[in-house]
Design a protein with these regions (language model features):
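NUDIX/MutT-family hydrolases
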Residues: 318-362
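Catalytic cores of DNA base-excision repair glycosylases
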Residues: 3, 9-213, 291
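The catalytic Nudix box helix
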Residues: 267-301
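Short aromatic/basic micro-patch
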Residues: 266, 311, 335-336
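Short, well-ordered beta-strand micro-motif
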Residues: 237-239, 316-320
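N-terminal strand-loop-strand
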Residues: 216-266, 295
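Acidic, metal-coordinating catalytic segment for phosphate/diphosphate chemistry
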Residues: 203-234, 306, 313, 342-361
Length: 365
């Protein structure tokens, strides 16, 4: 079984020989490390870089983020996905200001008291910013460690995950824990790849048990993938005057803050039920969410989108507003807007595609 003296020198020498130059690696500021680690969760590095740079220019410190409105935060995050990350960053920044005099806790245990910070993020911040020998365990590290010890157990099971956390804790060195953890993550990102690991380039190849036994393609062990559910969803571009136009007003709604895509704006609608036409689904959903009457019109566009655990086909229709004062029965807020001012609001990617189609077909904005 590989031990810390076997692993750390090899990994740190590889790191020192040349690692990726990324914006967040040019500082040990705990706030900057925190922002980068949250953005990098389930998101590619190339995607994160421009978002990180814009974020740090707009919110350069905890106080700036804590003092911003949630709408401003979500707008800056727009397009990055997994919006609960942005909401949690905002709430945790306010928590830091209120409970910690504007300074992040300096230990992994203390960091985990903040909203949205779990064991991985806490370990990354504590090791990189504060030199605490705290372990990290994300998808990349799970893959590296599972191959390193040739782990035959299902990596999605709690007992296996706990064993991997213990292994990670045993291997992290007291000296340069932040560099070690970053090297471990970069190794998983660039060399110890999921489908075709580049073992000839790996600094740990000579101590990797899976490499020695030829089982690296079989590690980590995971259960067969389940079929991803698919749903048909409807959305209405509800025109105040009933007629689509480049300068006409249409209705948008804000999703409840505590749900999926919470706080984002969208064209109102919802999921089609069995045996229901798309138009009937739109009428029903609008009544349930807003208590207003509409008449569906022409089909506008169809958007396919995959989320983490399900897929949707979004069918967007023009619709006319027939009456009733909008009530917030299933929404947090509503607004009547035009194409000229709709960009002030934060939308998910599916609704941005509807807006793009509106502009292409009507002009304006």
């Amino acid at each position: 079984m590989p031990t810390a003296p076997d692993i750390a020198p090899l990994l740190l020498a590889w790191w020192d020989a040349g690692h990726a130059d990324l914006p967040w690696r040019r500082t040990r500021d705990p706030y900057a490390v925190w922002v980068s680690e949250v953005m990098l969760q389930q998101t590619q590095i190339a995607t994160v870089i421009p978002y990180y740079e814009r974020w740090m220019a707009r919110f350069p410190a905890v106080a700036a983020l804590a003092g911003a409105s949630l709408d401003d935060v979500l707008k800056l995050w727009e397009g990055l996905g997994y919006y609960s990350r942005a909401r949690n960053l905002h709430a945790a920044a306010q928590q830091v200001m209120a409970e910690h005099d504007g300074r992040l806790p300096t230990t992994a245990a203390g960091l985990m008291d903040l909203r949205g910070i779990g064991r991985y993020t806490a370990g990354a911040i504590a090791s990189i910013a504060f030199d605490e020998p705290a372990p990290v365990l994300d998808g990349n590290v799970i893959r590296v460690l599972s191959r390193l010890v040739d782990l035959p157990d299902d990596a999605t099971q709690t007992a296996t995950r706990n064993a991997l956390w213990q292994l990670a804790a045993n291997l992290v060195p007291v000296d340069r824990p932040g560099d070690y953890n970053q090297a471990l993550m970069e190794l998983g990102q660039s060399v110890c790849l999921p489908g075709n690991p580049l073992c000839l380039l790996c600094p740990l190849a000579r101590v990797c048990l899976a490499r020695q036994r030829g089982t690296q393609a079989e590690r980590p062990v995971r259960p067969p993938r389940k079929r991803t559910p698919h749903y048909d969803v409807v959305a209405g571009v509800i025109w105040a005057t009933g007629t689509p136009s480049a300068d006409g007003r249409f209705l948008i709604t804000q999703r409840p803050l505590d749900g999926m895509l919470g706080g984002l704006w969208e064209f109102p609608g919802g999921k089609q039920e069995a045996g229901e036409s798309l138009e009937a689904a739109l009428v029903r959903e609008i009544r349930e969410e807003l208590a207003i009457d509409i008449t569906p019109g022409a089909h506008l566009t169809t958007v396919d989108h995959a989320y983490t655990h399900f897929r949707i086909t979004l069918h967007a229709f023009h619709a006319s507003y027939d009456g009733g004062e909008p009530q917030h029965l299933g929404v947090a807020d509503h607004a009547w807007v035009t194409l000229a001012d709709v960009d002030a609001y934060a939308f998910a990617v599916t609704d941005r595609k509807i807006i793009a189609t509106l502009r292409a077909s009507l002009g304006g904005g």
